[in-house]
Amino acid sequence: MYYEWPEASEAYAFRNQYLFGDDILVAPVTAPGKEGYATVKVWLPEGKWYEWQTGTMLDGGRTVERTFALDEYPVYVRAGAILPMYGDTVKNLNANDEEILLTLFPGGSGEFSLYEDNGDDKRYAAEFARTHLKSVRNGNLLTVTVGKRTGAYCGMPAERKFSVKVLASAAPASVTVDGAKADWTYLGEEFALVVEIPRTDCAAEKVVCIRYEDAEVD
């Protein structure tokens, strides 16, 4: 934490916390709990953060206290983050062409560089591919771009399907993928919007445009 916030005293005081990548804050439970529950104090740096378990957006610059069950994790995600995730069916990354779910945490624009290799040897330093992911919010328009894949590795898939999941979202007025009207699903219990990008060439850029009735949907 103190590498990212060297001038904040809390970064030194909360010694068990750490960042996983640029946008995920983890606060492990390190003390015994009672009857399957543990109370954890977490320091949230300045900015907006989403609690992973509940999807609640919290203001940073303060300490929060929360009780977690054994099957819950004190994990917080920075607002604006894009997190790519594989499905539950992935057994290994070699020649993996499974769908990738891009989960967006609203609160501003965000970027992510998706790195992939064959996951089966030591050539990862020289043989790999990257896909640039970007989300931009401008008024009532949210634009998500899946960039052209660059680089190469043995066995990489030529095509892939992506899905975009926007958390804390209202139902949209319209959705397009590469300029064409697209189907979408609204998960009312999660307040989340899901847009599927058809399986396409990984060397081609894909652009999702989500337009809302209201500019203030975050």
Each language-model region and where it sits:
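Catalytic core of carbohydrate-active enzymes
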Residues: M1-T143, G147-P172
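A short amphipathic beta-strand at an alpha->beta junction
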Residues: A170-G179, A204-R211
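Exposed regions on extracellular, virion, or secretory-pathway luminal proteins
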Residues: V75, V177-A180, A215-V217
